[in-house]
From Swiss-Prot:
GO terms for biological process: cellulose catabolic process. Keywords: Carbohydrate metabolism, Cell membrane, Cellulose degradation, Glycoprotein, Glycosidase, Hydrolase, Membrane, Polysaccharide degradation, Signal-anchor, Transmembrane, Transmembrane helix. The active site is at D438. This is Probable beta-glucosidase E. The keyword Repeat does not apply. Beta-glucosidases are one of a number of cellulolytic enzymes involved in the degradation of cellulosic biomass. Catalyzes the last step releasing glucose from the inhibitory cellobiose. Belongs to the glycosyl hydrolase 3 family. It is found in: Cell membrane. It comes from Aspergillus oryzae (strain ATCC 42149 / RIB 40). Residues 1-54, 508-527 are annotated as: Disordered. It is a single-pass type II membrane protein. InterPro entries: Cellulose_deg_GH3 (IPR050288), Fn3-like (IPR026891), Glyco_hydro_3_C (IPR002772), Glyco_hydro_3_C_sf (IPR036881), Glyco_hydro_3_N (IPR001764), Glyco_hydro_3_N_sf (IPR036962), Glycoside_hydrolase_SF (IPR017853), Ig-like_fold (IPR013783). SUPFAM superfamilies: (Trans)glycosidases, Beta-D-glucan exohydrolase, C-terminal domain.
Amino acid sequence: MPPPPFRDAPSSAKSSQRYTPLHESIPEELNDKQYSSDADSLPLSDPSDGEDDSEIRLRRVDRNGTRSNQATAYVPVVRKSGDVEAYFDSIAEAELELLSASRQYDGVDDDDDDSDGYGVGVKRGQRQGLLKRTHDGRTGWRTVYYSKYWWRALIGVVVVLVLLVLVFLGLARSKQVGDELDYSMIPAESWFPSPRGGALKEWAADYQKAALLVGNMTLIEKVNITTGTGWQMGLCVGNTGPAESVHFPSLCLQDGPMGIRYADHISAFPPGLTTGATWNRDLIRERGIAMGLEARLKGVNVLLGPSMGPLGMMPAGGRNWEAFGSDPVLQGVAAAETIKGIQSNGVMATAKHFVMNEQEHFRQPFEWGIPTALSSNVGDRALHEVFAWPFAESIRADVASVMCAYQMVNNSHACENSKLLNGILKDELGFQGFVQSDWLAQRSGINSALGGLDMSMPGDGLHWADGKSLWGSELTRAVLNTSIPMERLNDMVTRIVAAWYHLGQDQWERPPPDGEGGPNFSSWTDDQTGWWQQASVEAGDQDGGWGIVNKYVDAGAGHGDIARKVAAEGIVLVKNNNNTLPLSRSPPSPYRIGIYGDDAGPALGPNACPDRGCSQGTLASGWGSGTVEFPFLVSPLEALQGAWETEVEITPYLQNMVMPVSVQDKDLCLVFANANSGEGYIHAGGIHGDRNDLFLQKGGDTLIQAVANNCAGPTVVVVHAVGPVVVESWIDLPGVDAVLFAHLPGQESGNALVDVLFGDVDASGRLPYTVGKSLEDYGPGAQVLYENNAPVPQVDFLDALYIDYRYFDKFNITPRYEFGFGLSYTSFELSKLYIKSMQWKSRLPKSRPQDQVSPPEYDTRPPVNENVLFPEGFHALSKYVYSYLPSLDGTAAANYTEYPDGYDLPRQPSEAGGDLGGNPSLYEEMAKVQVQVANTGARAGQTVVQAYVSFPSDVVEEGDLVEVPVDEKGETVTFVPSKEQVEFPDRVLRNFTKIALEPGEKKTVEMTLSRKDLSYWSARQQNWVMPDGDFQIWVGQSSRDLPLHGKY
């Protein structure tokens, strides 16, 4: 998302707009002289320039980073004699058989015309070194660009070509045996064409209305709807152009995942991490309803939340706090409930960031001074089972919009990755809404449209607020010259309009000049009057539209209770020696209380730093576009000062340093410490988005030790943090009596904390992540890449199946506090586990159902005799993104040839698809799990009953054909499929429920397990497979407290 308006966003190093096949290109802005050239062939380094001789060897690589369920690839490794490898041999995805050893980058000069590239003859460098492979009888291409020195790459090409000859000879021989070695189990890199929306009955009526409306729009109006008007070129952070002839309004898109950003009279709800820590489905839904209502009252069409990416694979990831925790099922449930709540008020929700936006370092090139964004590399199985899981649940919840991520996935930008957007999102998961880019995440024009992107935000292309769009007028030109099919544009527009109808926004009051609707606030000023097109005015154009921009509609009234309840239930009690908590409101007099740490106080106020881009005072949210302008913030100190019923002596020490004399006479010591992080465009306190480590910040660990070692009474530690923190330096100190992980509580911070400290609310939060004893405990695949490791930074998620607690279980690592853990002020006992089979097991789901309805048919012809030029006398605002063309240059139909390979070979629909979220058979109930829960304590309280599944052991799949001798001498051989072991985590969360019980009360809770819950994604079969054998069902109150066990 964008930087705040007060801050000039840095520019990328490249201004020319270029378009190359999405899976054959380093991103367009890469202009390092070592890697790009204007010549027809790339200049290679002279091998006699003093370099040592190089050794070429093959490295065996297992797909997906494991030896299960994947074939083996051999990757050429160029090694400098006596030196390190010259490139980082990251495996782009589980589908690779071979990687090429060289790469020719786009050769367009930096000074080329910005507006070219849409089928009008842009010069390109020659492609070299591509390796050909067979997939389902078709030809595909793979590229890689890790070689650091091109002369080594040339040698590598020769070696690889020799290997290819041997490989193809082997393939030819194997085809005489059968088709098994056609590698049909390996999904293609590309997926075309983009599936049309409107094939599901739930959306059929909306698509019919949308198709009719779109059919009456001009080309200019259609492009308007797909392209933002530019940064600060409307009242919201994102604004689309209108279609005035059919009275379709400009849409307002506004952050975010914890409330309405840049708006007045709204609520600062606890963010996603705190919400996930409640494990309370009903409460999460209530929060979503309140957020949706506030958006509706403010005139927001599209709320840019919830966030389920990052998933929390990296515990130090800067934006983990925006999402709901480090497990795909927990994330999926919380996201789905939030979406249902938001959309119940007619506001479109946005599931973001699709997908694998796990770290802030190198997510955007201009933020880090590098040529291009990093690539998050993952295998097909982990992509489905971990990262895409919560998005599937969001689509099942009928989400209207999905936002694609900044970085690349498997070396293709997420916002033009056709396998992700067309193949997985729109086909396999049945997504019926529209895909929007994150702000400036679009990196190409033609390829992003063909790859599945439907809306470009904020409209500007490669730079902030420059008015130069990758779509806009260039999309108009591309449709006219037929380089982008008219059918694709029609589907893009219809998806957006259908979502508008689907949420009932056609019934909203129309914005001016037709009515008084639309956004009633400005993201750029708090004053009542202001400019409608702020960026134009800042560029010197005084025609940016002045008027009333803030109507100060009170949207947050009545939502404080919901915010407070979420914050309280999101507090996790992890230590409580001798029942230190809850505190008494009537302690004996005199009673001296010390409150320590700047995290306890208000300091300079909640909005002292724009987008909360600093750490001062109590920590109530992380920083970045996912936060809001707080209407107020109740600090812990303020709430505590009025919490006791009898007279007590409270002395605050709002610094992170303390002298023993300030502690030794206290009857109770409350210590506050925090750890902060946020989005990568803000650097604060030496933190560049991602945390540098998992320790408390600003001397928090030292402060806790000093207080705990000297306090005369018990010490209670309160931690406000964006994720797990390492507590080993103080957690076992005798003086540390109680510890609360209060996460990020939002505006009601102090009030919610007091509710739990004094027992007005039970301590019922549970950890949505694992607290390890060190950062290294989470595994090498969970570490942020802090130093650039290649021309295109590579992050390999080799252990992604083993995220968080799964990694601890796999390697038998003892955490400090496990996933799902949390103490209560009462006690609970689970008993009487009963598992009921609901239907017979079968290995595969039912066949994909046929389309429920026919999607709209579109006119595939470009418009004829339609005026696409700026109207005569039209005053074009500076920086505004228009769809009009200044001239007809480049609009003649052209034989565009730069399409990605496979574009003209339509893909077959996935057997895993067929409805919202996938094949409906995947969500059929296979088993019911019942358990009795009893409150055995003396207080009312809540607990979270958690169900985990262990998959059968010794699961195998048929692999590649291998030679097996028929006779003893081995002179005759046959080919048989190899047997490959399929690995699984020890156990995985599959369901949970939160239950409230009075003292002595018992209740039976019931949870279901679906086919998908009991299946794994087979990269070979490209489907969800339920293995034969017994499943172990575990039920308890955390991932390591599972007293009940049964079989299914």
